[in-house]
Protein backbone atom coordinates (compact mmCIF):
# COMPACT_ATOMS: atom_id res chain seq x y z
CA UNK A 1 0.00 0.00 0.00
CA UNK A 2 2.91 2.37 0.73
CA UNK A 3 4.22 1.86 -2.81
CA UNK A 4 0.83 2.77 -4.26
CA UNK A 5 0.66 5.91 -2.11
CA UNK A 6 4.17 7.00 -3.18
CA UNK A 7 3.30 6.38 -6.83
CA UNK A 8 0.11 8.44 -6.58
CA UNK A 9 2.00 11.24 -4.83
CA UNK A 10 4.58 11.35 -7.63
CA UNK A 11 2.17 11.08 -10.57
CA UNK A 12 -0.86 12.95 -9.26
CA UNK A 13 -3.11 10.03 -10.19
CA UNK A 14 -3.77 6.67 -8.53
CA UNK A 15 -1.86 3.85 -10.28
CA UNK A 16 -4.62 1.29 -9.65
CA UNK A 17 -8.39 1.42 -9.54
CA UNK A 18 -10.60 1.42 -6.47
CA UNK A 19 -11.50 -2.25 -6.86
CA UNK A 20 -7.82 -3.21 -6.44
CA UNK A 21 -7.59 -1.28 -3.16
CA UNK A 22 -10.79 -2.92 -1.91
CA UNK A 23 -9.41 -6.39 -2.70
CA UNK A 24 -6.15 -5.60 -0.93
CA UNK A 25 -8.02 -4.36 2.13
CA UNK A 26 -10.09 -7.55 2.14
CA UNK A 27 -7.04 -9.59 3.09
CA UNK A 28 -4.56 -8.10 5.57
CA UNK A 29 -1.84 -10.58 4.62
CA UNK A 30 -1.89 -9.11 1.12
CA UNK A 31 -1.64 -5.57 2.47
CA UNK A 32 1.30 -6.22 4.78
CA UNK A 33 3.17 -9.06 3.07
CA UNK A 34 2.64 -9.51 -0.65
CA UNK A 35 4.39 -12.58 -2.01
CA UNK A 36 5.70 -12.67 -5.62
CA UNK A 37 2.52 -14.43 -6.73
CA UNK A 38 -0.40 -14.66 -4.36
CA UNK A 39 -3.96 -15.57 -5.33
CA UNK A 40 -5.76 -16.09 -2.04
CA UNK A 41 -8.14 -13.17 -2.65
CA UNK A 42 -10.77 -14.51 -5.09
CA UNK A 43 -10.36 -13.06 -8.56
CA UNK A 44 -6.95 -11.54 -7.83
CA UNK A 45 -3.31 -12.38 -8.37
CA UNK A 46 -0.37 -10.25 -7.28
CA UNK A 47 3.13 -9.82 -8.72
CA UNK A 48 5.97 -7.86 -7.11
CA UNK A 49 9.49 -6.86 -8.11
CA UNK A 50 12.13 -6.19 -5.45
CA UNK A 51 15.57 -4.62 -5.70
CA UNK A 52 18.77 -6.34 -4.59
CA UNK A 53 18.20 -5.13 -1.04
CA UNK A 54 14.70 -6.57 -0.88
CA UNK A 55 12.90 -3.23 -1.17
CA UNK A 56 9.60 -3.33 -3.05
CA UNK A 57 10.21 -1.69 -6.43
CA UNK A 58 7.03 -2.53 -8.33
CA UNK A 59 3.63 -4.16 -7.99
CA UNK A 60 1.06 -5.55 -10.42
CA UNK A 61 -2.49 -6.67 -9.73
CA UNK A 62 -4.20 -9.13 -12.08
CA UNK A 63 -7.98 -9.40 -12.16
CA UNK A 64 -8.80 -12.99 -13.15
CA UNK A 65 -12.59 -12.75 -12.78
CA UNK A 66 -13.19 -12.97 -16.55
CA UNK A 67 -10.52 -15.54 -17.34
CA UNK A 68 -12.77 -18.61 -17.33
CA UNK A 69 -15.71 -17.00 -19.15
CA UNK A 70 -14.02 -14.59 -21.55
CA UNK A 71 -10.39 -15.72 -21.44
CA UNK A 72 -9.30 -12.24 -20.40
CA UNK A 73 -6.90 -10.95 -17.73
CA UNK A 74 -6.96 -7.28 -16.69
CA UNK A 75 -3.90 -5.85 -14.95
CA UNK A 76 -2.78 -2.64 -13.28
CA UNK A 77 0.75 -1.91 -12.16
CA UNK A 78 2.81 0.63 -10.24
CA UNK A 79 6.56 1.28 -10.06
CA UNK A 80 8.01 3.17 -7.10
CA UNK A 81 9.33 6.60 -8.21
CA UNK A 82 12.84 5.75 -6.94
CA UNK A 83 13.00 2.63 -9.12
CA UNK A 84 11.79 3.99 -12.45
CA UNK A 85 13.76 3.54 -15.69
CA UNK A 86 15.64 0.64 -14.11
CA UNK A 87 13.67 -2.22 -15.65
CA UNK A 88 11.10 -2.86 -12.91
CA UNK A 89 8.16 -1.99 -15.16
CA UNK A 90 9.51 -4.16 -17.97
CA UNK A 91 9.92 -7.12 -15.62
CA UNK A 92 6.33 -6.75 -14.45
CA UNK A 93 4.97 -6.53 -18.00
CA UNK A 94 6.95 -9.61 -19.01
CA UNK A 95 5.58 -11.48 -15.99
CA UNK A 96 2.06 -10.48 -17.02
CA UNK A 97 2.65 -11.62 -20.60
CA UNK A 98 3.93 -14.94 -19.29
CA UNK A 99 0.88 -15.30 -17.04
CA UNK A 100 -1.32 -14.69 -20.10
CA UNK A 101 0.63 -17.27 -22.15
CA UNK A 102 1.72 -14.57 -24.58
CA UNK A 103 5.24 -14.27 -26.06
CA UNK A 104 7.36 -11.32 -25.01
CA UNK A 105 7.92 -10.36 -28.63
CA UNK A 106 4.62 -9.58 -30.40
CA UNK A 107 3.82 -11.10 -33.77
CA UNK A 108 3.05 -8.65 -36.60
CA UNK A 109 0.09 -10.86 -37.52
CA UNK A 110 -1.41 -10.80 -34.02
CA UNK A 111 -4.22 -8.24 -33.91
CA UNK A 112 -6.02 -9.68 -30.88
CA UNK A 113 -6.27 -7.34 -27.88
CA UNK A 114 -8.58 -9.43 -25.72
CA UNK A 115 -6.27 -11.83 -23.84
CA UNK A 116 -4.38 -9.33 -21.67
CA UNK A 117 -5.40 -5.77 -20.85
CA UNK A 118 -3.18 -3.41 -18.85
CA UNK A 119 -4.41 -0.07 -17.53
CA UNK A 120 -2.38 3.13 -17.65
CA UNK A 121 -4.04 5.62 -15.32
CA UNK A 122 -3.39 9.16 -16.45
CA UNK A 123 -1.71 7.96 -19.67
CA UNK A 124 1.71 7.99 -17.98
CA UNK A 125 4.66 8.40 -20.41
CA UNK A 126 6.42 5.36 -18.91
CA UNK A 127 3.37 3.23 -19.62
CA UNK A 128 3.27 4.47 -23.22
CA UNK A 129 6.90 3.43 -23.69
CA UNK A 130 6.23 -0.03 -22.26
CA UNK A 131 3.15 -0.45 -24.44
CA UNK A 132 5.12 0.37 -27.58
CA UNK A 133 8.00 -1.90 -26.56
CA UNK A 134 5.78 -4.94 -26.00
CA UNK A 135 3.28 -4.41 -28.81
CA UNK A 136 0.34 -3.47 -26.59
CA UNK A 137 -2.24 -1.39 -28.45
CA UNK A 138 -4.97 0.96 -27.25
CA UNK A 139 -8.14 -1.02 -26.64
CA UNK A 140 -10.17 1.25 -24.37
CA UNK A 141 -10.08 4.83 -23.09
CA UNK A 142 -11.69 6.33 -20.02
CA UNK A 143 -11.95 10.11 -19.68
CA UNK A 144 -11.73 11.90 -16.36
CA UNK A 145 -13.80 15.07 -16.63
CA UNK A 146 -14.33 17.81 -14.10
CA UNK A 147 -15.68 21.27 -13.37
CA UNK A 148 -15.66 23.83 -10.55
CA UNK A 149 -18.71 24.07 -8.31
CA UNK A 150 -18.50 27.80 -7.63
CA UNK A 151 -20.48 28.70 -10.75
CA UNK A 152 -24.20 28.61 -11.44
CA UNK A 153 -25.89 25.20 -11.42
CA UNK A 154 -29.06 24.35 -13.32
CA UNK A 155 -32.22 23.31 -11.53
CA UNK A 156 -32.88 19.59 -11.08
CA UNK A 157 -36.22 19.43 -12.89
CA UNK A 158 -37.86 16.03 -12.34
CA UNK A 159 -40.47 14.26 -14.49
CA UNK A 160 -44.03 14.28 -13.09
CA UNK A 161 -44.55 11.87 -10.19
CA UNK A 162 -40.82 11.41 -9.56
CA UNK A 163 -39.09 12.37 -6.32
CA UNK A 164 -35.53 12.06 -5.04
CA UNK A 165 -34.72 10.57 -1.66
CA UNK A 166 -31.61 9.25 0.10
CA UNK A 167 -30.44 5.64 0.01
CA UNK A 168 -31.54 3.45 2.94
CA UNK A 169 -28.79 1.10 4.08
CA UNK A 170 -30.04 -2.45 4.48
CA UNK A 171 -33.19 -1.77 2.43
CA UNK A 172 -32.36 -0.42 -1.02
CA UNK A 173 -29.48 -2.68 -2.05
CA UNK A 174 -31.54 -5.15 -4.17
CA UNK A 175 -33.28 -2.38 -6.10
CA UNK A 176 -30.04 -0.50 -6.76
CA UNK A 177 -28.28 -3.64 -7.99
CA UNK A 178 -31.22 -4.46 -10.27
CA UNK A 179 -31.32 -1.01 -11.87
CA UNK A 180 -27.53 -0.85 -12.03
CA UNK A 181 -27.39 -4.15 -13.91
CA UNK A 182 -30.02 -2.98 -16.40
CA UNK A 183 -28.41 0.43 -16.85
CA UNK A 184 -24.87 -0.95 -17.27
CA UNK A 185 -25.47 -4.33 -18.91
CA UNK A 186 -22.86 -3.28 -21.52
CA UNK A 187 -20.21 -2.21 -19.00
CA UNK A 188 -17.55 -4.81 -18.04
CA UNK A 189 -17.01 -3.55 -14.47
CA UNK A 190 -19.99 -1.49 -13.33
CA UNK A 191 -22.62 -3.85 -14.72
CA UNK A 192 -21.21 -6.75 -12.69
CA UNK A 193 -21.80 -5.12 -9.28
CA UNK A 194 -23.46 -7.47 -6.76
CA UNK A 195 -25.17 -6.77 -3.44
CA UNK A 196 -22.01 -7.99 -1.70
CA UNK A 197 -19.95 -5.50 -3.72
CA UNK A 198 -22.33 -2.72 -2.72
CA UNK A 199 -22.24 -3.65 0.96
CA UNK A 200 -18.44 -3.75 0.83
CA UNK A 201 -18.38 -0.15 -0.35
CA UNK A 202 -20.87 0.83 2.35
CA UNK A 203 -18.09 0.03 4.84
CA UNK A 204 -15.71 2.54 3.25
CA UNK A 205 -15.02 5.76 5.17
CA UNK A 206 -16.27 7.90 2.30
CA UNK A 207 -19.67 6.22 2.02
CA UNK A 208 -22.55 8.54 2.90
CA UNK A 209 -26.15 7.40 2.30
CA UNK A 210 -27.24 11.05 2.20
CA UNK A 211 -25.13 11.44 -0.94
CA UNK A 212 -26.60 8.34 -2.59
CA UNK A 213 -29.62 9.89 -4.32
CA UNK A 214 -32.46 7.66 -5.53
CA UNK A 215 -35.17 8.73 -7.98
CA UNK A 216 -38.42 6.88 -7.25
CA UNK A 217 -41.98 6.99 -8.55
CA UNK A 218 -45.16 7.34 -6.49
CA UNK A 219 -44.94 3.64 -5.54
CA UNK A 220 -41.31 4.04 -4.37
CA UNK A 221 -40.09 1.98 -7.34
CA UNK A 222 -36.50 2.86 -8.16
CA UNK A 223 -36.08 4.54 -11.55
CA UNK A 224 -32.51 5.76 -11.30
CA UNK A 225 -29.80 6.88 -8.92
CA UNK A 226 -26.83 9.19 -8.52
CA UNK A 227 -24.18 7.89 -6.16
CA UNK A 228 -21.81 10.69 -5.15
CA UNK A 229 -18.43 10.44 -3.46
CA UNK A 230 -16.19 12.93 -1.66
CA UNK A 231 -12.44 12.31 -1.85
CA UNK A 232 -10.05 13.05 1.06
CA UNK A 233 -8.89 16.26 -0.65
CA UNK A 234 -12.48 17.53 -0.78
CA UNK A 235 -13.05 16.87 -4.48
CA UNK A 236 -16.54 15.58 -5.19
CA UNK A 237 -17.21 12.79 -7.66
CA UNK A 238 -20.14 11.82 -9.81
CA UNK A 239 -19.41 8.24 -8.78
CA UNK A 240 -22.23 6.47 -10.65
CA UNK A 241 -25.35 7.73 -12.41
CA UNK A 242 -27.66 4.91 -13.48
CA UNK A 243 -31.13 5.10 -15.02
CA UNK A 244 -33.38 2.13 -15.77
CA UNK A 245 -33.57 1.74 -19.58
CA UNK A 246 -37.39 1.77 -19.39
CA UNK A 247 -37.17 5.29 -17.94
CA UNK A 248 -34.53 6.78 -20.22
CA UNK A 249 -35.35 9.62 -22.57
CA UNK A 250 -37.18 11.91 -20.14
CA UNK A 251 -34.16 13.79 -18.79
CA UNK A 252 -33.99 11.89 -15.51
CA UNK A 253 -30.25 11.20 -15.84
CA UNK A 254 -29.49 14.90 -16.23
CA UNK A 255 -31.78 15.81 -13.33
CA UNK A 256 -30.11 13.25 -11.08
CA UNK A 257 -26.68 14.54 -12.09
CA UNK A 258 -27.62 18.13 -11.24
CA UNK A 259 -29.15 17.05 -7.93
CA UNK A 260 -25.88 15.33 -7.04
CA UNK A 261 -23.83 18.38 -8.01
CA UNK A 262 -25.98 20.53 -5.75
CA UNK A 263 -25.51 18.05 -2.91
CA UNK A 264 -21.73 18.06 -3.34
CA UNK A 265 -21.60 21.86 -3.40
CA UNK A 266 -23.72 21.99 -0.23
CA UNK A 267 -21.18 19.64 1.40
CA UNK A 268 -18.40 22.14 0.64
CA UNK A 269 -16.83 20.61 -2.47
CA UNK A 270 -15.09 23.23 -4.62
CA UNK A 271 -14.84 20.98 -7.68
CA UNK A 272 -16.28 17.74 -8.99
CA UNK A 273 -14.99 15.00 -11.28
CA UNK A 274 -16.30 11.92 -13.05
CA UNK A 275 -15.18 9.06 -15.28
CA UNK A 276 -16.81 8.31 -18.63
CA UNK A 277 -16.00 5.94 -21.49
CA UNK A 278 -14.33 7.91 -24.29
CA UNK A 279 -16.65 6.37 -26.89
CA UNK A 280 -19.83 7.22 -24.93
CA UNK A 281 -20.44 10.36 -26.97
CA UNK A 282 -24.02 10.80 -25.73
CA UNK A 283 -22.93 10.93 -22.07
CA UNK A 284 -19.97 13.18 -22.88
CA UNK A 285 -22.28 15.68 -24.59
CA UNK A 286 -24.54 15.73 -21.52
CA UNK A 287 -21.57 16.40 -19.24
CA UNK A 288 -20.16 19.06 -21.57
CA UNK A 289 -23.51 20.86 -21.49
CA UNK A 290 -23.14 20.78 -17.70
CA UNK A 291 -19.75 22.52 -18.15
CA UNK A 292 -17.54 19.49 -17.54
CA UNK A 293 -14.21 19.43 -19.40
CA UNK A 294 -11.72 16.60 -19.90
CA UNK A 295 -8.95 16.53 -17.27
CA UNK A 296 -7.00 13.44 -18.30
CA UNK A 297 -7.35 9.94 -19.77
CA UNK A 298 -6.96 6.38 -18.52
CA UNK A 299 -5.92 4.00 -21.30
CA UNK A 300 -6.31 0.23 -21.38
CA UNK A 301 -3.68 -1.39 -23.60
CA UNK A 302 -4.23 -4.89 -24.93
CA UNK A 303 -2.69 -7.92 -26.60
Swiss-Prot record:
Every N-acetyltransferase domain range: 1-150, 162-303
Catalytic reaction annotation: 1D-myo-inositol 2-(L-cysteinylamino)-2-deoxy-alpha-D-glucopyranoside + acetyl-CoA = mycothiol + CoA + H(+)
Binding site for 1D-myo-inositol 2-(L-cysteinylamino)-2-deoxy-alpha-D-glucopyranoside: 18, 189, 229, 237, 275
One Pfam family recorded for the sequence: Acetyltransf_7
Annotated SUPFAM superfamilies: Acyl-CoA N-acyltransferases (Nat)
GO molecular function: mycothiol synthase activity; protein-N-terminal-alanine acetyltransferase activity
EC number in record: 2.3.1.189
Superkingdom classification of source: Bacteria
Binding site for acetyl-CoA 2: 241-243, 248-254, 280-285
Amino-acid positions noted as binding acetyl-CoA 1 in the UniProt annotation, renumbered to this chain: 77-79
Keyword list, A-Z: Acyltransferase, Repeat, Transferase
Any Gene Ontology biological process: mycothiol biosynthetic process
EC primary class: transferase
Classification via HAMAP family: MshD
Complexes and interactors: Monomer.
Family statement: Belongs to the acetyltransferase family. MshD subfamily.
Function: Catalyzes the transfer of acetyl from acetyl-CoA to desacetylmycothiol (Cys-GlcN-Ins) to form mycothiol.
Protein name, as recorded: Mycothiol acetyltransferase
Source organism per UniProt: Saccharopolyspora erythraea (strain ATCC 11635 / DSM 40517 / JCM 4748 / NBRC 13426 / NCIMB 8594 / NRRL 2338)
Lineage: Bacteria, Bacillati, Actinomycetota, Actinomycetes, Pseudonocardiales
Amino acid sequence: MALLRETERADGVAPVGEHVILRLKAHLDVVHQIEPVQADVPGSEHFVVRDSGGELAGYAHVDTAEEKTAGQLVAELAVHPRHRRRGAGARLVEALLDRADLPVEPSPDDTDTARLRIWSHGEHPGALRLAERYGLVRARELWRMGRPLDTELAEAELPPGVTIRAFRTGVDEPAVVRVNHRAFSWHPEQGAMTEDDLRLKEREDWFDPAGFLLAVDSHDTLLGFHWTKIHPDGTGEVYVVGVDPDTQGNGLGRSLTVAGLRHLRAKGCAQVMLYVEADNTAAIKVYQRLEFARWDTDVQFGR
